[in-house]
Amino acid sequence: MSDAFNLSSTFVHLGLGATATPLPDFSWSREYLDAYTERFDADGNEGRLVCLMPQEATWDSWERHPAGEEVVILLSGRVDLIQEIDGEERVVPLGPGQAVVNPPGVWHTARVREPGQALFITPGRGTEGRPG
């Protein structure tokens, strides 16, 4: 049994065997991400990172997740999620309660129209980024 925690500061790893591991000290530092990858390596492409992230400004980069589909659920605010598919940009406008699936390997970014929060369920293995 777990005590309540704030998902915006304690992310959760979903792994094989229907496990859910809270990550109270999660960090986007390279050192932490390398340790995270090693710790959950046995989950392979089935592992997912669940996080609640503020959407305060348009992203300054693009990312893609070759290991699987990413679910993005906008809880508040207004965001245009932009996917690059076959060299074309596809804009998916999102409002509160709306969701989108980023297919495996599809580059995506976000343009924030009204600040809010989004819930991400991400297959992190092999994630790549590039400048916006």
Predicted features and spans:
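Short, conserved beta-strand element in jelly-roll/cupin
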Residues: P66-L81, I121
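Short beta-strand segments in beta-sandwich/barrel cores
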Residues: D60, G77-Q83, Q98-A99
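Short, surface-exposed beta-edge/turn micro-motifs
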Residues: G47, G68-V71, G116
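A generic "binding-loop/recognition-motif" signal
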Residues: A67, V106, E114
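Double-stranded beta-helix
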Residues: M1-G15, T109-G132
